[in-house]
From Swiss-Prot:
Residues 415-439 form a coiled coil. It comes from Staphylococcus epidermidis (strain ATCC 35984 / DSM 28319 / BCRC 17069 / CCUG 31568 / BM 3577 / RP62A). This is Putative cysteine ligase BshC. Involved in bacillithiol (BSH) biosynthesis. May catalyze the last step of the pathway, the addition of cysteine to glucosamine malate (GlcN-Mal) to generate BSH. NCBIfam families: thiol_BshC. The gene is bshC.
Length: 537
């Protein structure tokens, strides 16, 4: 496998602005991610004193896994005060979209580069967002069906979706295996299929909760890189977070005000408003089997799904006795994460790093310094067959990844069509319009006849448009093989109108290239980059 960088012309220039240190963007972060001085300064910040306790919690969380010596070494390094590079993601079905793996690679690569450059251990940590409760975001994935050259949605079906954190949810193993069977039914069978399939079955058999199954897959793929894993909803981690939960509750007004004020400043700089929330408390509580948002009405903290209410002291007591019932929303989660870890850099997706720009005031209010915020690597896999098709149709990979193939596909069809035929029909449309204009002069004093004439004219014009449309459709049918190939290019490099990594599932790559495709012995050596990466097989 080989890797090349690619400079895409992107509509969203946010990451390029970070790369170019534009003050419009960098002013909303503590550090300029593109400057070496930022790393020099961040690495000199004193530790928070929680690293040893945190290493014990992570070791406890990962205890049921068969840890590699790389992981054990990193747990020891963390206990000894090593700083971390961290990022997180929801626990998607079968690993979720490819960008989950790419985020983990970003964490691993940046931590390795910093370790080598500064001659000090920097530990890669992946944060599983098990406190999230939006099951519809994680219960499905997509498989590319080669025979039909289309993407197929694969979903875990249940009549009782969870109302609380996904970490609390135990899926039906038979239904999960049915979803797995559906996935492998859609993709082509290769020499690697049985190995990848059996790996997934073993993981489903071994673990019970939704996030533990996800953890098992991530560990299996990335264990040899030394990645450390932690679930945001892990009870022992919640015990550590009690002091900050209490501070967030005590400073509820200041936290909310600082968030709102910073968000206003970002929109004044023509940045999009990323965080949409009406709460003024920015914490959830597990109550009546549901994860419910807290909101202060001036006297009590009320819930968004039931009538129950609390005083501040009620909540402080719950935090002290049962901190696992409390969880963060999008505003407080980043601060809690960085309060726990001695972080050099946080790795986020494009949307994440945008909404972090709205949170600097919250970090300052809670006396937690925002780490360096870095965009994750963006990667596309280029199959040999796809490369051949690009050459066959003289298509630029940069253009296809950014914009798709529809314009080129339509041009191909037009070139196969008869220009004389289309021009004659267009001329007939022009004549029809002229006839309409002439006839209109005879009925200018009769409103009903004007409407009749207008309707009749539109019917004729629509028929001519339909004639051209059906004529071109017949051309497409005559060139069915080429149409399928255009569709294959699109669904591979620009699926659903976006990047491959936002739709395709990692299991598909493993099925095509091997169960060890993401392992250190097979995956190409990468360096951290703001540019788009192309990995060719």
């Amino acid at each position: 496998m080989k890797c090349n960088t690619l400079k895409l012309t992107e509509q969203d220039q946010f990451i390029n602005k970070i790369k170019n240190s534009e003050s419009q963007i960098t002013s909303f972060y503590e550090y300029d991610a593109s400057q070496k001085e930022s790393f020099d300064r961040r690495l000199k910040t004193p530790n928070n004193g929680r690293e040893f306790h945190l290493s014990r919690v992570i070791k406890s969380y990962m205890n049921e896994l068969n840890l590699t010596h790389q992981q054990l070494n990193n747990i020891d390094a963390l206990a000894d005060g090593a700083k971390v590079v961290i990022g997180g993601q929801q626990a998607g079905l079968f690993g979720g979209p490819l960008y989950t793996f790419h985020k983990i690679f970003s964490i691993i690569i940046l931590s390795r580069q910093l370790s080598e450059k500064y001659d000090t251990p920097i530990v890669p940590v992946f944060w599983i967002a098990g406190e999230d409760h939006d099951f519809e975001e994680v219960n499905h994935t997509y498989a590319f069906n080669n025979k039909e050259t289309t993407l197929k949605k694969v979903k875990y079906h249940t009549m009782t979706p969870p109302d609380s954190n996904v970490s609390r949810y135990t899926p039906d193993k038979n239904e999960l295996k049915a979803s797995l069977n559906h996935f492998f039914k859609e993709i082509k069978e290769t020499v690697h299929t049985q190995d990848v399939y059996q790996m997934c079955v073993n993981i489903i058999n071994q673990y019970d909760s939704w996030t533990d199954i996800f953890k098992g897959l991530i560990h299996e793929v990335f264990k040899d890189y030394g990645i450390l894993l932690i679930d945001a909803q892990y009870p022992e981690l919640r015990q550590m977070e009690k002091p900050l939960f209490k501070e967030i509750l005590e400073k509820r007004d200041q936290v909310d005000q600082s968030f709102r004020e910073t968000q206003i400043r970002t929109t004044q700089q023509q940045l999009p408003s990323m965080i949409q929330t009406e709460t003024n408390t920015h914490l959830f509580i597990h109550e009546d089997g549901m994860r419910q948002l807290l909101n202060f009405d001036g006297t009590y903290f009320k819930l968004n799904k039931t009538e129950k209410r609390y005083t501040k002291q009620n909540l402080l007591d719950i935090i002290e006795r049962e901190p696992e019932r409390i969880s963060n929303n999008v505003v407080t989660r980043p601060v809690v994460e960085e309060w726990l870890f001695n972080t050099v850099a946080f790795i986020g997706g494009p949307s994440e790093i945008k909404y972090w720009a709205e949170l600097k005031g919250v970090f300052d209010t809670l006396n937690v310094e925002m780490p360096i915020v870095m965009p994750r690597l963006r990667i596309t896999y280029l199959y040999a067959r796809t490369k051949k098709l690009l050459k066959q149709y003289n298509l630029s990979i940069e253009s296809v990844i950014a914009n798709g193939v529809e314009q080129e596909r339509q041009r191909f069809v037009r070139e196969k069509a008869s220009n004389n035929f289309i021009n004659e029909v267009e001329e007939m449309k022009t004549q029809q319009q002229e006839l309409y204009n002439n006839l209109l002069t005879y009925v200018e004093n009769n409103h009903d006849n004007q409407l009749l004439l207008e309707k009749n004219n539109q019917i004729h014009l629509n028929q001519y448009d339909y004639l051209i449309k059906r004529y071109l459709l017949n051309i497409e049918r005559e060139n069915d093989i080429s149409m399928r190939q255009f569709r294959e290019i699109s669904e591979t490099l620009h699926p659903m109108g976006g990047l491959q990594e936002r739709v395709w599932n990692p299991l598909q790559i493993m099925n095509d290239f091997g169960i060890d495709v993401f392992s250190p012995s097979t995956y190409p050596p990468l360096s951290y980059s703001f540019d788009h990466l192309i990995i060719k097989h």
